[in-house]
Amino acid sequence: MIQGIDYAAIAPPLIVVLAAIALLLADAFDVPRRVLGAVSGGALAAALIAVVALASGGRRATFCLPGGLRGNGPASCSYVADDFTLLFQGVVLAAAVVVVLLSLREIADARMPAGEYHFLLLAAITGALVLVAARDLILLVVALETLSLPVFALVALRRYDGVASEAAVKLFLVSVVSAAIMLFGISMVYGATGAMHLDRIAPALQRLPDHLSPVAGVGVVLVLAGFAFKVAAVPFHFWAPDVYQGAPLPVAAFLSVVSKAAGFAGLTIVLALGFPAYGHVWGPVVAVLAAVTMTLGNLLALRQRTAIRLLAWSSIAQSGYMLAPLAVGPRRLPEAVAATIAYVALYAVMNLGAFAVVIGYGARGKRFAALDDFRGLARTRPAAGAALAFFLICLAGLPPGVMGLFAKVVVFRATVAGGVTWLAVVMAVNTVIGLYYYLAWAARLFAAPAERPSAPVLAEPGPAVRAAVAATAAGALVLTVAPQLVLQAVTAAS
């Protein structure tokens, strides 16, 4: 028998989904765009306050089933609001507030329907919030699809735009295939263990008969493949560059940060709580995925000449770094999970900041801003140029971008401590490769502005975009001064 619902535990996603419904209804009454944007941002801020309030209390859970044959054992819960969940929900909501700020001008310039845009965005955020709290495979899949489905529409919401429509179709097709692969894997895991809750799957896998072990192993790998799509790991990455380029830029930022963070949360939950007994199976798979992902992402980023495609391939390479600690398998798994989560949290600030500057200061009237369009930005707009240069240096992991260096050191240390030394060497080589394209773009910012007649005219950002750039820059500065705060919080949560 399922217990009553703990509404306090589900308060963050509940606030967001109620706001999404209210926005959809308000759009029918021709409410001004600014009001819709204010409601959207206010709902996310309220949900963030709810997360902070929950963090001051203890662990909460809901949708629970009694454990044991007679219902007298520990309960298995589908939704758990523990420190891990609240940490990720905080990251998702903080990043989502920045995405809303970046979206306000984009909605007006691209003449997108504001009500539909904010409804779809909040619906996707609801899926992300539930995903990081899910503790059974059914809720994980439902949350993952709740996150994915609105994004298809967001990518294509710029009507009469063939590039956006093509990107949406590509994202939809790849997502459908990956969902089918994951569902097939879940069915195999359920067939072998007879359980859907992760805390019941883990002991069931430990005592599995030999004839069911191959079935469970294949199921584990297929579930991993489904999450590999969400985090854009090679070879499930090929949707990312075209979708980032075709989508509205705030949606690309959402995919690069919020969607990726939720995907890594789901992946670590499944591997650490559900499949630790099969670490000898998924550990080597993750190691190969990490090595190939960071290598291909960095090599193809070297060839890019537009800002968004460079950020897309850079994001793919960063996924490889995030995967690397998980390659240790069951050995030192808590430390590996903490390293991955810390990297995700620090990456969210760095990458979202870079997107904010590109969105706010890209060449006016150009759909795809080239890297050369930002030449001299630090001379004409010193604050924006310095901010973008700082974000790029952080992503490269080079001082004075200490937060980026700290993130890479944490991941490198966890990988070496777990005994996957060859992967640490691959990561070190890829870090050197990444220095080239990050520093090449940063150098353009301080070069003399282009004097050719066709030189682009940079856009003037509105107050919302300026606030987004300022917020991410402030966060990056704080975490550069004290990056250990993130690792301490993550270690306590994991």
Predicted regions and their residues:
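Alpha-helical transmembrane segments of multi-pass membrane proteins predominantly involved
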Residues: 1-494
